[in-house]
């Protein structure tokens, strides 16, 4: 049975500013990549955290059937949120421990729903540290952002 991995990343030029998200999906058997799919998208005015969340959401939502998958992210915000903080937020009616509304609540709710139909293992990796699949996800995120970046004026 092949193993399924989603390598996810978000990018933002300014925070807020134009941003993009990228996903590298891989089905692997042993050392052999059986199937690979790349996804990306972006927004004109966003934040890095929103793009990191959208990368994970799109990775899970694109799967056609319930799957066992490892989602690899360089975002401690996403990893800590989905494996820890989210349980308290849900218990507190989507409020933080300080009784403030959770930032990006609509995306956290969407991620919660997206992961519910899968058996997800979440893994954090250090970003920009030479991890080839994470670097590819970063390239995809920057490609997703590109249409939303202002064009540089030529001198």
Curated annotation (Swiss-Prot):
Q: Per UniProt, where does Mg(2+) 2 bind?
A: 9, 138
Q: Does the keyword Nuclease apply?
A: yes
Q: Which Gene3D superfamilies match?
A: Ribonuclease H-like superfamily/Ribonuclease H
Give the keywords, sorted: Cytoplasm, Endonuclease, Hydrolase, Magnesium, Metal-binding, Nuclease
Q: What cofactor does its activity depend on?
A: Mg(2+)
Q: Name one GO molecular function term.
A: RNA-DNA hybrid ribonuclease activity
Top-level taxon of origin = Bacteria
Catalytic activity as recorded in UniProt: Endonucleolytic cleavage to 5'-phosphomonoester
Q: Name one GO biological process term.
A: DNA replication, removal of RNA primer
Where is the protein localized? Cytoplasm
The segment(s) forming the RNase H type-1 domain are 1-146
| Binding annotation for Mg(2+) 1 | 9, 52, 74
Q: What is its main location?
A: cytoplasm
EC number of the protein: 3.1.26.4
Instruction: Give the protein family.
Output: Belongs to the RNase H family.
* Stored PANTHER family: RIBONUCLEASE H1
What this chain does, per the record? Endonuclease that specifically degrades the RNA of RNA-DNA hybrids.
What is this protein's name? Ribonuclease H
Organism field: Ruegeria pomeroyi (strain ATCC 700808 / DSM 15171 / DSS-3)
Q: Which gene encodes it?
A: rnhA
